[in-house]
C-alpha cells in the first residue's frame, strides 16, 4: 500500500507542477504572419507616399491582437524581420512606419536589423 500511496502522491505533485506551468509555445507561426501580410506587399514595395490599404491595416491589427504573450510578440517580430530580409524591393521606411499608419503600437521597428530578443 505504501508504494501505491507514494506513486499517487508523486503523480499529484507532477500534475500540480504541469497544471501551473505556463505554456511555452507560441500561438503565432511564421506562416500565419507572412501569409497574412499579402495585402500589404504592394504598399511595402511602394516608393511613393500612398495610403495603406484598409485590408492591410486590418491584418496588422489582427496580428497585433493575436500576439498576446512575449513569446508570440517575439515570434511575430522574428517573422517580420525575416520577411523584411526576404522581400525584394521592400521600402524599409514604409515597413517601419506601417504599424503607426494603421494605428497600432508595437514594441519594435519592422526592420531587418531589429533585435527581437529584446521584445517584451
From Swiss-Prot:
PROSITE patterns, per database record: PLANT_LTP (PS00597)
Annotated tissue distribution: Expressed in protoderm cells of somatic and zygotic embryos, and transiently expressed in epidermal cell layers of leaves, flowers and seeds.
Cited Gene3D superfamilies: Plant lipid-transfer and hydrophobic proteins
GO terms assigned for molecular function: lipid binding
Pfam families assigned to the protein according to its UniProt record, in alphabetical order: Tryp_alpha_amyl
Top-level taxonomic group: Eukaryota
Disulfide bonds: 30-79, 40-56, 57-102, 77-116
Signal peptide coordinates: 1-26
Transmembrane region(s): none
Alphabetic keyword roster: Disulfide bond, Lipid-binding, Signal, Transport
GO BP: any one term: lipid transport
CDD domains linked: nsLTP1
InterPro entries recorded: Bifun_inhib/LTP/seed_sf, Bifunc_inhib/LTP/seed_store, Plant_nsLTP
Homology family: Belongs to the plant LTP family.
Protein purpose: Plant non-specific lipid-transfer proteins transfer phospholipids as well as galactolipids across membranes. May play a role in wax or cutin deposition in the cell walls of expanding epidermal cells and certain secretory tissues.
Name by which UniProt lists this protein: Non-specific lipid-transfer protein
Provenance organism: Daucus carota (Wild carrot)
Amino acid at each position: 500500500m505504501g508504494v501505491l500511496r507514494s506513486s499517487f502522491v508523486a503523480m499529484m505533485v507532477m500534475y500540480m507542477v504541469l497544471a501551473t506551468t505556463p505554456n511555452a509555445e507560441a500561438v503565432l507561426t511564421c506562416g500565419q504572419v507572412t501569409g497574412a501580410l499579402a495585402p500589404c506587399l504592394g504598399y511595402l514595395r511602394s516608393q511613393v507616399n500612398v495610403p495603406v490599404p484598409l485590408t492591410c491595416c486590418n491584418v496588422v491589427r489582427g496580428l497585433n491582437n493575436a500576439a498576446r504573450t512575449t513569446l508570440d510578440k517575439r515570434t511575430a517580430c522574428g517573422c517580420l524581420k525575416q520577411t523584411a530580409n526576404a522581400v525584394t524591393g521592400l521600402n524599409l521606411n514604409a515597413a517601419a512606419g506601417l504599424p503607426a499608419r494603421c494605428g497600432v503600437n508595437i514594441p519594435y521597428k519592422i526592420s531587418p536589423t531589429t533585435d527581437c530578443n529584446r521584445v517584451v
